[in-house]
Every structure is written in C-alpha cells, then in structure tokens.
Amino acid sequence: MLGDGNEGISTIPGFNQIQFEGFCRFIDQGLTEELYKFPKIEDTDQEIEFQLFVETYQLVEPLIKERDAVYESLTYSSELYVSAGLIWKNSRDMQEQTIFIGNIPLMNSLGTSIVNGIYRIVINQILQSPGIYYRSELDHNGISVYTGTIISDWGGRSELEIDRKARIWARVSRKQKISILVLSSAMGLNLREILENVCYPEIFLSFLSDKERKKIGSKENAILEFYQQFACVGGDPVFSESLCKELQKKFFQQRCELGRIGRRNMNRRLNLDIPQNNTFLLPRDILAAADHLIGLKFGMGALDDMNHLKNKRIRSVADLLQDQFGLALVRLENVVRGTICGAIRHKLIPTPQNLVTSTPLTTTYESFFGLHPLSQVLDRTNPLTQIVHGRKLSYLGPGGLTGRTASFRIRDIHPSHYGRICPIDTSEGINVGLIGSLAIHARIGHWGSLESPFYEISERSTGVRMLYLSPGRDEYYMVAAGNSLALNQDIQEEQVVPARYRQEFLTIAWEQVHLRSIFPFQYFSIGASLIPFIEHNDANRALMSSNMQRQAVPLSRSEKCIVGTGLERQAALDSGALAIAEREGRVVYTNTDKILLAGNGDILSIPLVIYQRSNKNTCMHQKLQVPRGKCIKKGQILADGAATVGGELALGKNVLVAYMPWEGYNSEDAVLISERLVYEDIYTSFHIRKYEIQTHVTSQGPEKVTNEIPHLEAHLLRNLDKNGIVMLGSWVETGDILVGKLTPQVVKESSYAPEDRLLRAILGIQVSTSKETCLKLPIGGRGRVIDVRWIQKRGGSSYNPETIRVYILQKREIKVGDKVAGRHGNKGIISKILPRQDMPYLQDGRSVDMVFNPLGVPSRMNVGQIFECSLGLAGSLLDRHYRIAPFDERYEQEASRKLVFSELYEASKQTANPWVFEPEYPGKSRIFDGRTGNPFEQPVIIGKPYILKLIHQVDDKIHGRSSGHYALVTQQPLRGRAKQGGQRVGEMEVWALEGFGVAHILQEMLTYKSDHIRARQEVLGTTIIGGTIPNPEDAPESFRLLVRELRSLALELNHFLVSEKNFQINRKEA
C-alpha cells in the first residue's frame, strides 16, 4: 500500500484493496461507533436498566469454511458477542452476561461475501457530499437568481435564495418559503443577535417590515410561523413545548443533520470554526450562508461546480455495512424494550440473555445482501470480471440518481476525474456515465473523497516524494501529464510539457511544474489498461473493448497474448484464480485436487479448484504447475486457474487474421473462420450447467425420490442409480430423467380409469395415487454428469426442503452464430466455417484462421488493432512477447509505427521471408485464394491479434417456436426464449416483405401466426386433413384492440371486409 511521503518508484496497489480497506474500517471503527450509540433502556417504572458494554465485544472465527458455505448454500459469517448488563435500580444489583446478538457476513480473500452460498459484492456509491453549494439560474426575465442549497448527510435539501430586492428566503419544501429572519428567530436568535452576526446588517434591515417585526418579536411567534409553513397546517396553531420538540426533532435534527463530512465542508466553504462534533445546522451556518449569498448577488465570491469530485463523496462498503448495523441495533432496541415491559407485566425475572435475540441483526444483513441495489451477485465469467466488478462506482442506488433523470452533464467526463475515475470504462445504454470504474492508483480517503498519487517536483531536494491528493487540492498545482519521467527518471525532460491547472489543460515550461504523474496507466481502469495501443483507438471503441473483455469465456487451452500491456500478471494474481504458496517448503505430493507442501516441521494441504461452476456457467478449474519434489518460495504460483497461463491473464488466442472481403461472408462485421479452430479445439470452452429439484413434505405425505417411476420408458431412466439420482459420469441427452421423484396426491373416485376402478372393486388392489414430478434435462442441456449433491438441511421440515443438484459439463466448440471480439472494440458474429483448403493462404503456405472486414476499421477509428495485428505477426515469427505501455508517442513521434515496422523488418531478416516486410506496402502482403490458387489483386494486412470468444453463444440464444402462449390483451405470441415466445415482425420487417411482394407470407405473419384467434385455430385442422387454409374473414385481434382504445377516447371506427363479390370497379374508357 502506498502512503504519503514514500520515496522512489511506486508499485501498483492491490486491485481488491478498496474492498479490504472498507471492510476492515467497518470492523475496527464502524461496529464500535454504532454500539456506542445504543442507548440505556429502562422499563416504564424505571426500575430496570439494560445496557451494552461496548469495550468487550468479540467476533468469533466462522465454524465453516468458504467452500462448505458455497456447497451447502450457507452464509460465511462470524458470530458477534457483546457483554450486556441488567441493573436493578432499587437494590443496585447488576447481572452481566456475554450475549450473542447476531451474525455478520465476512469478506473473503476475493473482496466478496458468501450469502446463502452465493458470492455477492458491494459496489461503492458516489453521492453529493453534504454541505452548501451555490449556483445561479436565469429567471423568465433573464435575470440571475442565486441559490444556496444545503444538503444534509442523508440527502435532504433545503435552499436559501435571494430575490431581485435582495430579500433572502429559506425554502424548506418545494412550495413553501419563509424569511431567513423567521428561520433564525425560530432557531433561537433575536434581532439584535442576528444583526451582530452578519456582514450586511443594513440589507437585513431593509426588508424588515412591520409584519416581519411582529413575526420575529418573540421566539414563540417565530416558531409558530415556521411550524405553520414547514408542517403545512391550516388555522392558527398554539405554541407548546411538544410543538417545539417536534420541530426540533423533525427539522433541525433529522432534516438538517450535516454529519462529520458535512460539518467539515460547511466550515471550509463559509470560513467557520465550529467544532466537528456539532453535526447539526446552527444559526451561525444560516447567517454565514446568507452573507455569502449577498456577496454573490453583488459580484463577490464564486459559484460551485456540483459535478466536481471535491463536491462528491464515496459511500464505501464500510458506510453501507455500518448503516445496516445501526438499523439492526434500532430494531434490537425496540425488541429489548418490548421484552422488558412484557417480563415486568407477567412478573418474570429477565436476564440479558433472555432480552436479546439475534433475529434483527441476522435478518437485516440477509435482506441487505439480498435486496439492496448496491449488493450484487459477483460476476464470475472470467478472472478479470471478478476484479473489475469490485472496483465499480455507481451514481445509482438509494440517495443517488436514476438512469431516467440523470442529465448529460452528470454523465460527462470531468477534469477532476483525472487519475481517479477512468474516462473510458463505463457501461453502455441507459446507465452510460452513471456506472464508472476506479482508476488503478485511486484510493478512498479518510473523508470519503477519491485520492490520486503524484510525484512532487522540488528544486531543493533530489529525492522523489509521493503525495496522495484529494480533488480539491490538486487543482492548485501545475500537474504534468503523460511525461516520460513516469517510466524513466533518467531521461532529460523536454522544455515544454502538457499540464493541468485549475481544470484547464495547458502547455507550460518544465520549471513551472509542481507535480507529475507516477505511471502511464494512472488514468485508466484495469479493463482499459489491458488494451495495447489504446491511444490509437476512438474512446467509444475502447469502452466497448473494456466491457467485452469481461465477457470473454475461459478456453480449454489458454494462451498468453503476444502483445500486451504488462498488467496481465497483476490482474491474474489479484483475481484469486491462481493457487499461491503461502510459505516456503517442498512439494511432497501432488494430485488433481490438492498439493501437499512440507516445511517448518509440518505439512500444509492446499486444495485446488476442480471443475467449479461460476454463476455464468463457465468452468473454473486449476491446473497444476509444480512437480513433486520441487522447492517452493513464498508467493510462487502453484497452479494456474481458468484463463491464466504462467500466472498471466489469458482470455483469448493469438490467431492468424487477414483483413479482406470474402464473398460477402464478412460484411457488416461478420467473421469468416477456418475449420482448424474447430477441429484443433482452438476456441473450445467448457460450460457447467446446474439443475436442481427440491423434495417437500406435502399435506398428503413426503415426496419420494426413487428410480421406480411408472408410465415412463426404461430408456429415459437408464442413468438412474438405486436411489433414483443420475449416476456420475453418465452422458445425458435432452429429455432424460436426472432425478426420479413421485409426489403424492388425492385422486377422486370419478377420475380413476375404468380398469383401476375394476381392480379396486374385485381384488381390493390400491392403485398408486402419485404423480411423477421428475427433474428432466431441458433442450440444449446434453452433456456429462460431473457432480451430484444431495443437500439435507437440519430439521428436514417442509420449511427446510432437501435439495438435489446435478451438474452437467458441456464441451462447446466454436460454431456459426458465436460472437468473437478483439481488444479494440472490433466484434463480430461467425458467419461461415470454411475448410482449411478454401481459406486464403500466405506465401509460406499457412492458411489464415480468420477473415475480418477491412471496412470495420476506418469508420470506427480503432487503428490500434492494426498495430497489434502486425506486431503480433512479428512476435510469433521471432518467438517474442511484447508488453507496451500506452502513449508511447511521448518518447518520439510515430513511435508505435516505428516499433511495429522495425520488428517486422527484423522478423523478415531472421526468417528469410521477404513477404513479412515489403517496403512498397509495409505491414501488408500478397496472399492467395485457397479455392483457385491465384493471388488476390491487392496486398492484404495479415497478422496475429489476440481474439476472444465471448459469452454470447448461439447455443444459449437459438430458439424456435411452433406453438405456445399468447398475451391476454393483444393475443399475440409472448416475447423471449424463456417464455417460448415468437419472433416479432416489426414495422421495418413488414416493409421488407412488402418490397419483395410476398403478399401471402405477409398475410400469414399478420394473421395466422400472430393474433387472428379464429384463423389460427382452423390452421391445425385443415393441415391435418390436407385441405387449403381458409382466408381470414374478419379483423385480427390487434385491430379490434385499436378500435376499442379509440372508443375509450369517444372515437367510433367502423370497418368492413372488402371481397371480390361486393367490390366493383367503375372504369371509363379514355
């Protein structure tokens, strides 16, 4: 971890560090703060007092391991114990016990929590920081209206505004406003104190009318006036102490609580010296805010930029968990209070153990992790996805914005994001700009602000000092951006460098620079930092790339990228996908599922992950990397995980690519591939699907798991064992029974078949009254059974049913319809798989693996893929791997092109292949048509880029419908694969059919296959008897629906069918 004042070269911080620090802060500080707030509870007669002794709380080590929690669908949590005392005031006796108040879910080494067997992660939220903010708006006359908005700690807003006559009003709700003099008087000041504490007393006196003097003549009158406006009550309220307490509680304490951060911001903005423990709005704050508002009216002071990061705060894991803990303690307080009163009423002797229950705390955290918008299921598609998910920042959530109401200005990039929030990595769609990602070196400061590190440049000292600066501090410094010293301190700096000062980007002399960047990747997130040559790409395509890398499927045979950025190893290390040695030792035993490490006189067993399913059905598997007998150092890699090779992230494959059109099969971003990628398992991936069934205890008896299922073919039951569960290693097809289950049911006498009634009457044989409710393999689920789990919950009641889970492994080769993508936003769908002999081939005889469309490069402006493509070819011929930092043009102009050309030239020399680098068209080569053997007319760019296979696979998306459910209102087929829905024929599809004149097909689409109820019923019968399908004689249901909707608007629409019989054409001869 980097701290202030570190000397020398920095290291990249742990990518999960933000989550770890937040949870540790909650355990160390948040728990204690909330426990100290727990009040002393007395009964109604004030004879018994209950209190908690915070100093002695303890968290117990979990009884189960992480793996067992996932396996048994339990929560990986720690039990919280606190000392509590019960004091009898009459006798001064005290009974003290250590009580269990609930379970707190713990964070594991990945920065996630396991709740009910599911990995969940808490997202950091960006909120407007509490304090006061001044802005200016134009009214309908074009005159500036100045407003000061006071934001409380929980997000409530109150406004101060100044009108054209320099009168100041306080707006406590959208509709009601009162004079600031009334508000100040209600808060306890008289007129003399108000005028003594403001800078412009004459302005306050100028709008003081006789009516106003009467309102503020006494504190009681001011409170009544304010209460009438604030509570919006009619009539004349009467002053009382209860009214005063209610106003104090509802407004001055709840609505205007600034909190620790708000008090600090208010003091800084208004130059106040109020102590930090005064977290509520005071009369001094109101008067100082009014003074500043008057100054703005007369051209003094500055307005606030609400989108600047200095005016934002991060609501981290610690804050969210602490809020939930406080909520649970409030519920616990109500429970204890009610239990004490009940015990006294029934003349029972309470004990601390009897008064406290663990339900409030446990249920509060379970509902938080299960229902809160900022608690999400961890995306585990690949190792990169796990890290990036924990570093997200969201403007959404409770107290934040919504995708529908957020403006463009909020979504846009701000200069204060520099080095703190990645300008590239955000979601696409309605949440663009609202969900961001932390920059690599950013950290959350003590006051909830995002801090970024810089090197301080000082003429006095030769050493280098690192500073972490908040957004409000670094705007006062000249910050040099992207200079060469970020990597090599020995290079002599240029005379003029680009710099940032007060949210402006300037070009200044090196002597004027105060701070400089510490790393070229400092401004980007992890996803964007893994894109080589990102400086040559359009930002929109880089955004797509950083999102698509998270969708890459781990392949069965992973491969390191030839061209990378150098962060691949750190990303793999922090993802938790690797097995790392925790200490030195010697490997004494290895197996597919564990490693035994001997050292310090004992043996450490390190379990490996074997064919574990992620929540995106991808396969997580660790492969051994150390032989038996090898000596291991601490931190050494013992096993590679999914999508890692040699400890580096490996999401895709280096394949030979040509950029050229090919018979139209790669138009509109389609991709043509060679069958070699299929037969040699280049892009083969494993996927694990989970199928589960539960056995309940019904009112007719318990459900039974068995292999004796009547009325089912023996072929469907062939894979079941004697218990009725599918056997491990079985190959199952669609429709096979995975778990045989019978459910008892009550059958009426009249519903028996005749032969069943005869058997009962003559022989007295009891006919089975069970129905089969087996778990069957759905369509597209064929594969190999790799695991079966029978989870039996304690108790075995109907509320805790037994669960049987079957895991099936599928091997998926790449096929037509799958989605592939590069690292530069170049994505496409496989359109055709060609035989190797038909693919274009190079001058050395090698056939190309993929053919991309060259028209996808110029308009998208992602030229980085061309640099990567050519450099990858050179690296494959020279057997080299390149790790290139972004913005290499800071060393010299055209640095990227010079590097690529020099490597291609060297590859051409070493391999004696002049076609690798031809001076007439460098980077291109003449290639041949595999079908004819003739060369193509133009030279073509060929290379070896890194191509990913994405999770969007055709096996999960392909769907067909013959018949199914219809919507109740429109009578049209439902939408979506999950609902067995139909294919929508929209407006543009109808135009296309009209353009080709296919009238009968169009009529079928709009009637029989859609919402013509009578016609679609007749289709089946006429098809069976072989007759012609009759034409529909009335309007479809959607048209009738339109007519009914028009009738609701008092518009009558009559319609009739025009046929050949009653349709006459009167035509006159010319």
From Swiss-Prot:
CDD domains the UniProt entry points to: RNA_pol_B_RPB2
Name of a matching Pfam family: RNA_pol_Rpb2_7
SUPFAM superfamilies: beta and beta-prime subunits of DNA dependent RNA-polymerase
Catalytic class of the enzyme: transferase
A GO term from the CC aspect: DNA-directed RNA polymerase complex
Subcellular location field: Plastid, Chloroplast
Molecular-function annotations in GO: DNA binding; DNA-directed RNA polymerase activity; ribonucleoside binding
E.C. code: 2.7.7.6
Alphabetical keyword list: Chloroplast, DNA-directed RNA polymerase, Nucleotidyltransferase, Plastid, Transcription, Transferase
Catalytic activities: RNA(n) + a ribonucleoside 5'-triphosphate = RNA(n+1) + diphosphate
GO biological process: DNA-templated transcription
Highest taxon listed in the record's lineage: Eukaryota
Coarse class of the protein's main subcellular location: plastid
Function: DNA-dependent RNA polymerase catalyzes the transcription of DNA into RNA using the four ribonucleoside triphosphates as substrates.
Subunit structure: In plastids the minimal PEP RNA polymerase catalytic core is composed of four subunits: alpha, beta, beta', and beta''. When a (nuclear-encoded) sigma factor is associated with the core the holoenzyme is formed, which can initiate transcription.
PANTHER family in the record: DNA-DIRECTED RNA POLYMERASE I SUBUNIT 2
Protein name: DNA-directed RNA polymerase subunit beta
The organism of origin for this protein: Nicotiana tabacum (Common tobacco)
